[in-house]
Amino acid sequence: MHPAHLLVLLGVYVSLLGAARIPPLPLNLIQFSNMIKCTIPGSQPLLDYANYGCYCGPGNNGTPVDDVDRCCQAHDECYDEASNHGCYPELTLYDYYCDTGVPYCKARTQCQVFVCGCDLAVAKCLAGATYNDENKNINTGERCQ
């Protein structure tokens, strides 16, 4: 085998090792994102809301910075309540459909109904809230006390 072929194979191998360490997005997060796209066509929820304010994304403390952040706070609280009822919101998949900008839940189990209801409420809430670019990627240590 030629040395150039070995280098190509080594490159492919290293690339595959790196890709194997990238965790996939939970299916519920993708489903949730699509529900938001139903109420806010053209949005990119995974980018727009990933690090917005004190509650949209991984953080969840302090005083919400605006209505968008209050929507995310309510969603966090709804997921907490679902967890208190024995559900696993981040892992729960459900059926829903979108009709002219309005999502509808078609959930079957109690946990699907609960989680779909949480996602439905925040999707509608975000659609009615004004997005402020200044609240994206804020210093949560300073602003979320």
Curated annotation (Swiss-Prot):
Primary localization class, coarse: secreted
Annotated localization: Secreted
Tissue specificity statement from the Swiss-Prot or TrEMBL entry: Expressed by the venom gland.
SUPFAM superfamilies reported in the protein's UniProt record: Phospholipase A2, PLA2 (SSF48619)
Keyword annotations of the record: Disulfide bond, Neurotoxin, Presynaptic neurotoxin, Secreted, Signal, Toxin
GO CC terms of this entry: extracellular region
Signal peptide range: 1-19
Superkingdom of this protein's organism: Eukaryota
Gene Ontology molecular functions: calcium ion binding; calcium-dependent phospholipase A2 activity; phospholipid binding; toxin activity
Disulfides per UniProt: C38-C98, C54-C144, C56-C72, C71-C125, C78-C118, C87-C111, C105-C116
Subunit (UniProt): Heterohexamer. 2 forms exist: 2 A or 2 B chains, 2 C chains and 2 covalently-linked D chains, and 1 A or 1 B, 1 C, 2 covalently-linked D chains and 2 differentially glycosylated covalently-linked D chains. Textilotoxin was originally described as pentameric.
Function according to Swiss-Prot or TrEMBL: Snake venom oligomeric phospholipase A2 that has potent presynaptic neurotoxicity. Chain C is not itself neurotoxic, but it is essential for the neurotoxicity of textilotoxin. Chain C possesses a very low phospholipase activity.
The family this protein is said to belong to: Belongs to the phospholipase A2 family. Group I subfamily. D49 sub-subfamily.
Name this polypeptide is given: Acidic phospholipase A2 homolog textilotoxin C chain
Taxonomic source organism: Pseudonaja textilis
Lineage, opening ranks: Eukaryota, Metazoa, Chordata, Craniata, Vertebrata
